[in-house]
C-alpha cells in the first residue's frame, strides 16, 4: 500500500521572464514502511518538493495523496489538522518552543489535538533519542544536535 503518491508535481516561482521552475513533473510513490532519500545539488528543488508534499506550500500543478487523501483538495482548516496528525516534519531551524522543556516540545503536537500523550511511547522516544536525562531542560540548555533530536521526537510522537 502506498502511503504517499506524487503525480506530475510542478512548482514555479514568479511569473513571465522571472519565472523559475523549481519542480518539473515530479512523480513517485512511497510504500508504507519504506524510506527514501531525496538528494541533489543546492537549488535543485529538494526543499521545495518537501514543502509542497508536506502541504506547507502550494503546487503550481500536479497531485499529492497522503494515506489515500488528496491533500490539495482539502479546505485549509482540515489540511492543518491533517498535516499535524499525518505528517512528521523536521524544520531546518527545528522550531522548538523556547518556554517548553524537551518533553513538552515533543508532546506539543498531541496537545494541539487535545490528545493525551502515551507516556510509555514518549519515554521510549526520549530513550531512543538519548534525551531521557534532558527531558526537563529548555531548548536553550541543549546542544544543536540535542535540539535536532527533540524535533525528531516531535515529528514521530503522533506516529505519522
Per-region residue spans from a language model:
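ABC family nucleotide-binding domain
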Residues: 2-160
Amino acid at each position: 500500500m502506498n502511503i504517499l503518491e506524487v503525480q506530475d508535481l510542478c512548482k514555479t516561482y514568479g511569473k513571465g521572464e522571472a519565472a523559475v521552475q523549481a519542480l518539473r513533473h515530479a512523480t513517485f510513490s512511497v510504500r508504507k514502511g519504506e524510506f527514501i532519500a531525496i538528494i541533489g545539488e543546492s537549488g535543485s528543488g529538494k526543499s521545495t518538493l518537501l514543502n509542497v508534499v508536506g502541504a506547507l506550500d502550494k503546487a503550481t500543478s500536479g497531485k499529492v495523496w497522503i494515506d489515500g487523501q488528496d491533500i490539495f483538495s482539502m479546505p485549509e482548516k482540515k489540511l492543518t489538522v491533517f498535516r499535524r496528525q499525518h505528517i512528521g516534519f523536521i524544520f531546518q531551524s527545528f522550531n522548538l518552543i523556547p518556554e517548553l522543556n524537551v518533553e513538552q516540545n515533543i508532546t506539543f503536537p498531541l496537545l494541539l489535538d487535545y490528545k493525551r500523550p502515551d507516556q510509555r511511547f514518549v519515554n521510549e522516544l526520549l530513550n531512543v533519542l538519548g534525551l531521557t536525562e534532558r527531558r526537563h531542560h529548555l531548548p536553550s540548555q541543549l546542544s544543536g544536535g540535542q535540539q535536532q533530536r527533540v524535533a525528531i521526537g516531535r515529528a514521530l510522537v503522533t506516529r505519522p
